[in-house]
């Protein structure tokens, strides 16, 4: 099985340097070109460059937009390809991907990506808030639970439900950046017979701050239901 796994992302100060790595397995590494891409938040995928195979002398080619700041190298004994980056700016903030080149511009295998944030802002751990409906509002056949992850920096956080065992009915919304802090939310819809009789937990990890938080979704309430409308007595005839 072919695998590509990137690592090395994180928070870097403007003007700093960083090297990303892409560990590969499942194929004869020296026979293939390897390429790097990046995708800034809300923007298109951008090709950065490639390093050719043994038959082509392991030569490199780069996007002109990089202006010589990035270098690609490979360790053939370890089947790893690297991306070395210098003089980083906020515009370099992106998720970086490595890809195997099948032929020409056909990329047949990709990694999952590693995120780089270039900023002078400080690392901040998230606050995690479980969101549950008020008792009495779960009379239908399904119920939607939520999890709010607020005030963290930098990206990314990972959010799962029941440590990943609950994946059906999950909707995780894109993170929003405001005042140098991110906010992210996720919801999961389950049957009313599942919750609250069974435990449901929101699991959040923020690698940059080494934070892991598990929040069990507890029912809110009990609440006082309003009285039925009063009925006026019929007037005396």
UniProtKB/Swiss-Prot annotation:
One of its GO terms (biological process) is immunoglobulin mediated immune response. Residues 106-120 are annotated as: JH2 segment. Disulfide bonds join 22-98, 147-202. It is found in: Secreted. Residues 1-119, 126-218 form the Ig-like domain. Keywords: Adaptive immunity, Disulfide bond, Immunity, Immunoglobulin, Repeat, Secreted. GO terms for cellular component: extracellular region; immunoglobulin complex. This is Ig heavy chain Mem5. It comes from Mus musculus (Mouse).
């Amino acid at each position: 099985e072919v695998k590509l796994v990137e690592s090395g992302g994180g928070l870097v100060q403007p003007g700093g340097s960083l090297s990303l790595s892409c560990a590969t397995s499942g194929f004869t590494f020296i026979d293939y070109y390897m390429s790097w891409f990046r995708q800034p938040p809300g923007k298109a995928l951008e090709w950065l460059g490639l390093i050719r195979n043994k038959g082509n002398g392991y030569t490199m080619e780069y996007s002109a937009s990089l202006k010589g700041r990035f270098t690609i190298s490979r360790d053939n004994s370890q089947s790893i390809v690297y991306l070395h980056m210098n003089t980083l700016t906020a515009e370099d903030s992106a998720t970086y991907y490595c890809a195997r080149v099948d032929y020409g511009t056909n990329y047949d295998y990709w990694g999952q990506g590693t995120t780089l944030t270039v900023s002078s802002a400080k690392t901040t751990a998230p606050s995690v808030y479980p969101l549950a409906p008020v008792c009495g509002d779960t009379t239908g056949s399904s119920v939607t639970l939520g999890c709010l992850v607020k005030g963290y920096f930098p990206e990314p956080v990972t959010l799962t439900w029941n440590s990943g065992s609950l994946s059906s009915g999950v909707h995780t919304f894109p993170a929003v950046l405001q005042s140098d802090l991110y906010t992210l939310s996720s919801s999961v819809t389950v049957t009313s017979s599942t919750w609250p009789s069974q435990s449901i937990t929101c699991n959040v990890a923020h690698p940059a701050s080494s934070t892991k938080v598990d929040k069990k979704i507890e029912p809110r309430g009990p609440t006082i239901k309003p009285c039925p409308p009063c009925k006026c007595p019929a007037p005396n005839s």
